[in-house]
């Protein structure tokens, strides 16, 4: 028998082409009259957002836009958005953009009803009060943040990425419309695509995996195997874009209800120290961490390889695991994922940050969910391998 698992996902999920057309009625259903729109400088100026704003206005819903979210959202973003929300007396938040905008929106929504600083709630289930309604519209097929009870915000005073996990962070509604992803540039498609695979893989091999998250994780992995390369080579392929959008959402449902592991634990310090986008740092680390981990969960990792189509179902677990590691390296090369040394990180700066990054990674708790739990020295070696 297995232990009970607690699953958190949004109460309303709209999926498919035209899903964003349901935003107005859904916001109205929650009794929200004035929204704070949370986005980044690029997405805040797109025709897609203008279309949404016009629909909201036609439905009698007012809005004000905070469009300054940075690629890795900070506590400063949350404070700026919160100040605007209070100034205009908004009673709901609509996050429009990639995972950064959605994560920032989550922070703003819960801090609208809770006191103190966001850093007070770093960790698990520490937010006392439910936030104001949050509506999430992802525009990248990547983080799956629209489905999760997780936000990751950088504490700028400590140079630490805070992982905050709490049911109060789950959006009230998510609108997963793959037509928003057609204009994603190739590098972003690659970064968030391999990030999506990381979510599915880590959720599946996590020590906290359960029967429900296994279903979401395997679906995520299968969709990535079918569609990532096609989406990268043919950005206007609707089937590939839809498949990757579903993969991202399923990956989010999976990892938020099982947990991420060593890749994410090591990725956050990289982002905090060197301002690497979350998806890119995950993608860079995935092959090395998988090579390190496979011996401790061969059955699970071999299933991942077979689900991706990289190994035959008749092959041994060891053969499939070997093909998984080589396949991840080949995937990164094929979609032009760089090494850390190619990301404007000098060897001197990298070595000076190595101890702190390893310590922060281990302290995050995520490595303890990994099939093979690393030591501090192991983490340092893995950083060096990825460099």
Segments predicted by a language model, with ranges:
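N-terminal amphipathic/basic leader segments beginning at the initiator methionine
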Residues: 1-30
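A glycine/threonine-rich phosphate-anchoring loop and its flanking beta-alpha core
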Residues: 11, 113-209, 300-307
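Short glycine/serine/threonine-rich phosphate/pyrophosphate-binding segments
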Residues: 20-23, 45-48, 75-78, 100-106, ...
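Glycine-rich phosphate/diphosphate-binding loops that line cofactor/substrate pockets in enzymes
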Residues: 21-36, 54-59, 87, 334
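N-terminal small/polar loop signature for handling phosphorylated ligands or for N-terminal nucleophile
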Residues: 44-117, 230-241
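Active-site segments that bind and position negatively charged phosphate/pyrophosphate groups
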Residues: 203-330
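Mobile late-domain/C-terminal helix-loop "cap" segments
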Residues: 287-387
């Amino acid at each position: 028998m297995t232990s009970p698992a607690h699953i958190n996902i949004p109460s309303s999920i709209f999926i498919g082409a035209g899903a964003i057309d349901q935003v107005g009625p859904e916001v109205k259903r929650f009794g929200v009259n004035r929204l704070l729109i949370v986005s980044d400088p690029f997405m805040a100026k797109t025709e897609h957002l203008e279309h949404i704003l016009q629909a909201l206005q036609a439905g009698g819903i007012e809005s004000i836009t905070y469009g300054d979210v940075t690629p890795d959202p900070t506590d400063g973003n949350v404070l700026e958005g919160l100040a605007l929300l209070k100034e205009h007396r908004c009673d709901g938040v609509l996050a429009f953009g990639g995972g950064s905008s959605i994560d920032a929106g989550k922070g703003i929504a819960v801090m609208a009803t809770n006191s103190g600083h966001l850093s007070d709630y770093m960790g698990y289930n520490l937010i006392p009060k439910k936030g104001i309604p949050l509506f999430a519209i992802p525009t990248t097929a990547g983080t799956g943040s629209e489905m999760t009870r997780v936000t990751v915000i950088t504490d700028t005073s400590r140079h630490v990425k805070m992982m905050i996990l709490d049911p109060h962070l789950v959006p009230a509604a998510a609108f997963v419309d793959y037509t928003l992803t057609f204009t994603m540039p190739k590098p972003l498609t690659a970064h968030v695509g391999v990030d999506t695979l990381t979510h599915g893989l880590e959720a599946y091999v996590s020590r906290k995996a359960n029967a429900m998250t296994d279903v979401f994780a395997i679906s995520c992995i299968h969709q990535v195997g079918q569609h990532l390369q096609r989406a990268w080579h043919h950005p206007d392929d609707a089937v590939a874009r839809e498949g990757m959008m579903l993969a991202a959402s399923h990956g989010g449902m999976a990892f938020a209800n099982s947990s991420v592991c060593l890749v994410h634990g090591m990725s956050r310090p990289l982002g905090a120290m060197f301002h690497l986008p979350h998806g890119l740092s995950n993608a860079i680390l995935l092959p090395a961490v998988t090579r390190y981990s496979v011996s401790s969960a061969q059955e699970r990792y071999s299933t991942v390889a077979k689900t991706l189509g990289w190994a035959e179902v008749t092959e041994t677990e060891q053969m499939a695991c070997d093909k998984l590691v080589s396949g991840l390296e080949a995937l990164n090369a094929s979609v032009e994922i760089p090494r850390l040394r190619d990301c404007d990180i000098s060897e001197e700066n990298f070595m000076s940050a190595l101890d702190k990054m390893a310590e922060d990674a281990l302290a995050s708790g995520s490595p303890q969910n990994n099939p093979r739990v690393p030591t501090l020295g192991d983490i340092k070696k893995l950083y060096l391998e990825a460099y």
